[in-house]
Amino acid sequence: MIRRAFGKTGLMVSALGLGCNNFGRRLDLEKTRNVIDSAIEAGINFFDTADVYGDRGGSETLLGATLGTRRNDVILATKFGLPMDDEGRLAGGSRRYVLSAVEASLKRLKTEWIDIYYLHRPDPATPIDETLDALDELARQGKVRFAGCSNLPGPQLADAMEVARTKRRRSQRRRTNTIC
């Protein structure tokens, strides 16, 4: 399988990635294992999931259980921010939620780090700089290699990138690798 550079991250990802939304919802552990084994045999090394996939955590749990010792050979991307409960309290981009959500994802994925951790959708209740600060903290702790975003409209994406650039200029060093 052809590998391509993932932006300026230094990561080399397979030309095809595997979306893991069906794991834990339509596919049980055995079927998930078959899909992942086939994907890895075909040369796929990029696996994309989210904490809400597979009925709130099921996809990450099955992916973590299946990868095992192959974790070092793959690029794991997961998202946070969509509601993990019926009331919608376990959601968003607040610092408090981001820090707790990553711990839950790390546990389900059975890994010490996430290669790409990204906000699933905009959180109108949280300033983007708060979310970026939390992601920066996770990068400094080694829990997240790169931060990104998903489903942000162009103007919000531009604002997020400007906030990240401004903070980086102020700190005189780059601590978080933001790819959104």
Predicted regions and their residues:
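Beta/alpha (TIM)-barrel catalytic core signal, keyed to glycine-rich beta->alpha loops juxtaposed to Asp/Glu
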Residues: T126-C180
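Short, acidic/polar
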Residues: L27-A39, G93-K110, D133, L157-M161
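N-terminal binding-site loop/beta-alpha segment at the start of enzyme catalytic domains
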Residues: M1-V74
